[in-house]
């Protein structure tokens, strides 16, 4: 399936970085203090969420203070020697790590080594100026991240969720083709499954970002319901992808299906693919009949193994029973997805009728 992708050349975070740098320079020029350290701090302080900007800003300030202190100390005793740079960098990194100021280590180290060549005397004054410039960069960037284009990830998460439905269905289709042919799945299918897992991880990360900033911004009830819907959908899709991953790892070339069993399995998986492509909004009666047939097959295979008494070690589940179990598990997730969608639609209709 060909999908039209929209590429944003300049995203919100890039725009906010530019605004933060611009405002930081204006503030520094107004107070007649050096701009370079403030600008560096402003750039790295822009985070995906306002919460992270505040938390990491509180870490970067003391870290930069440590870097500045080491820079001035070693410059005072050793001058502008190579050893001054090395010791300032090393001591800054070690101290930040020991004090668990991990988010500020990079900025602090850059500050330390950059201060040495531009400071010839008045070391304490230079130290205080550096604190002022660092504070300016942190404060300006945090305010910009909080008030200008505040991050909202609900639409992005919804887009990722829809893409996951489509790609998951496509992988199921590829796996079905391999099953029908009795061959191992292709490297392309394995690669596609890896990409789906990466997309899922990305979507879950966006959910975490949205949750972090949830308390700082107002949301309508509709936005809150929409967010909770996609959050639950992602959780269930994560389980579906887990079951598909198990299917991909199950040896299908050793399966010994009857023609009728293979046909029922084929029709069931085709039905699952259609449901996924429809975002689990509808499951017809024919699908439930196929699931009942598949359920009977599963217990038949399990009972056959239970009565089997081999002389040597054997697996408690055959490849056939594993495949049937995973497909039935995927169906359970589809039912939950459908119930969630129906509940969401019902709440929307109720609220529309009230208003």
UniProtKB/Swiss-Prot annotation:
It comes from the Bacteria. Pfam families: ArAE_1. Its main location: membrane. GO terms for cellular component: plasma membrane. The chain crosses the membrane at residues 19-39, 74-94, 109-129, 131-151. The keyword Membrane applies. It is a multi-pass membrane protein. It is found in: Cell membrane. InterPro entries: ArAE_1. Belongs to the UPF0421 family. This is UPF0421 protein BCE_2776. The lineage of its organism: Bacteria, Bacillati, Bacillota, Bacilli, Bacillales.
